From Swiss-Prot:
This is Homoserine O-succinyltransferase. The gene is metAS. The record marks G111 as: Important for acyl-CoA specificity. Belongs to the MetA family. It comes from the Bacteria.
Length: 309
């Protein structure tokens, strides 16, 4: 699915170097196709890096996806140039009257911060409430899963004593579920979080269906039966080097982090890591776009039929 982005977005050249099909707005305007409209609420500090990661995964299918980047934190960013934010991001007020086929809410490094202490917590709640009537399907990633479970289901914040960091094995519970279609029975995916997601908590306090778990019994992938909301507690979008960058950052900060599990060859941080989850990440996002977005969204977004209560 060629992603449709502004001509000047840095991700265009970055992804084309990887032979990823990116369609600029100027080229897409010549095609008489109704693209899928996908809104990305990017909560990560290094926004350009996160854009590249998600856009790479959204590009792997034959239909157009029109990407809109959203920000809700008006504070000055220390990691992303203001010019980039001003040129490529919209504010909530710019899109609140629009409808979208899909919404992705990224993770954020807020695992040890109480919800009410998050500077933009009211805006997070506003976007999630808005999405019930304006978005066909929403995908929450890592910290956003924890936030959504609290807002939508009233589940208190669950925090691990130690950070979960590394590449872990998972197994699917429903091999014929649409979101896991084509998955191997067991697959690898990276995690980097303090948030805790015991599968029993999801089963006992929500009506969500768990589709994949970690070997330790944590919920990894779960969704509502009507496909309106889906949750992934790991980071299938991560590059091969992302966990390494986080590890060495924490080492330099004197935090004495554990070496990410099952990541560096021979468990030696001096060795170059390789991505062992790339096919899983691509298939997950392709399935979400196809089965949770494309196949249930109306052709005319003005005729949305929200079912999420």
């Amino acid at each position: 699915m060629p992603i449709r982005v502004p001509d000047e977005l840095p991700a265009v050249n970055f992804l084309r170097e990887e032979n990823v099909f990116v369609m600029t707005t100027s080229r897409a305007s010549g095609q008489e196709i109704r693209p899928l409209k996908v809104l990305i609420l990017n909560l990560m500090p290094k926004k350009i890096e996160t854009e590249n990661q998600f856009l790479r995964l959204l590009s792997n299918s034959p239909l157009q996806v029109d990407i809109q980047l959203l920000r809700i934190d008006s504070r000055e960013s220390r990691n992303t140039p203001a010019e980039h934010l001003n040129n490529f991001y919209c504010n909530f007020e710019d899109i609140q009257e629009q409808n979208f086929d899909g919404l992705i809410v990224t993770g954020a490094p807020l695992g040890l911060v109480e919800f009410n202490d998050v500077a933009y917590w009211p805006q997070i709640k506003q976007v999630l409430e808005w999405s019930k009537d304006h978005v066909t399907s929403t995908l929450f990633v890592c910290w956003a899963v924890q936030a959504a479970l609290n807002i939508l289901y009233g589940i208190p914040k669950q925090t691990r004593t130690d950070k979960l960091s590394g590449v872990y094995e998972h197994h699917i519970l429903h091999p014929h579920a649409l979101l896991t279609r084509g998955f191997d029975d067991s697959f690898l995916a990276p995690h980097s979080r303090y948030a805790d997601f015991p599968a029993a908590l999801i089963r006992d306090y929500t009506d969500l269906e768990i589709l994949a778990e970690t070997e330790e019994g944590d919920a990894y992938l779960f969704a509502s039966k009507d496909k309106r909301i889906a949750f992934v507690t790991g980071h299938p979008e991560y590059d091969a080097q992302t966990l390494a960058q986080e590890y060495f950052r924490d080492v330099e900060a004197g935090l004495n982090p554990d070496v990410p599990y099952n990541y560096f060859p021979h468990n030696d941080p001096q060795n170059t890591p390789r991505a062992s989850w790339r096919s899983h990440g691509n298939l997950l996002f392709t399935n979400w776009l196809n089965y949770y977005v494309y196949q249930i969204t109306p052709y005319d977004l003005r005729h949305m039929n929200p079912t999420l209560d």
